[in-house]
A protein has these predicted regions:
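Bacterial N-terminal signal peptides
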Residues: 9-19
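Short beta-strand His + acidic residue motifs that chelate non-heme Fe in jelly-roll/DSBH
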Residues: 76-78, 96-97, 118, 123-129
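Short acidic-glycine-tyrosine-enriched beta hairpin
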Residues: 46, 94, 100-121
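A short, N-terminal "cap"/entry segment at the start of jelly-roll beta-barrel domains
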Residues: 22-64, 150-157
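Glycine- and acidic-residue-biased ligand/ion/polar-headgroup-sensing regions
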Residues: 71-74, 81-101
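Double-stranded beta-helix
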Residues: 30-32, 105, 125-157
Length: 157
């Protein structure tokens, strides 16, 4: 082993030990974070999709951020929200359609890396087809969803 190689062979473990011994704690009043192990996922028993609230409470007024994993074959039916909602597709392909007629074949693929906005009161539907899709959702709560009932369906009731 060369002299330089010997130096680095001894220096690297020492540097690693020093870095773990000098771990810096972040002030939670300045920087908030959740490590992957700290993110609590829950399963929606109705749809089977998984959600994890990252920030805020989407059922209350104020900002929120939620992770949502759509499972293959799950699609919402036409609905709308009272507030704008913002999305970033993190993995998989999320399929999005608009209008009051549910037609999964008329959806458009949104691959990972795509940013999407659902404008307030815009009727849409979305979900996953053959692979899971994980998206980050954020907006101003309360985040409610109202099923869309087409005018012709309301007249029949």
């Amino acid at each position: 082993m060369t002299r330089m190689g010997s130096f680095f062979a001894g220096a690297i473990p020492a540097l690693l030990m020093m870095s773990s011994a000098c771990a810096i704690e972040l002030d939670p009043k300045i920087v908030g974070f959740k490590l992957p192990a700290d993110i609590k996922w829950t399963e929606n028993t109705r749809s089977g999709n998984r959600t994890a609230v990252l920030q805020g409470d989407p059922t209350k007024p104020g900002p929120y951020a939620v992770l949502l994993t759509w499972l293959p074959g799950n699609m919402s039916r036409p609905h709308f929200h009272p507030n704008d909602r913002f999305f970033m597709v993190l993995s998989g392909t999320w399929w999005v359609g608009n209008g009051g007629k549910f037609d999964p074949e008329a959806t458009v693929p949104m691959p990972a890396g795509t940013h999407v906005i659902h404008w307030a009161k815009g009727v849409h539907y979305d979900g996953a087809k053959t692979e899971p899709a994980t998206i980050l959702v954020w907006g101003e709560g309360p985040a409610t969803s109202t099923p869309f009932v087409a005018a012709e369906n309301m007249e029949k009731k």
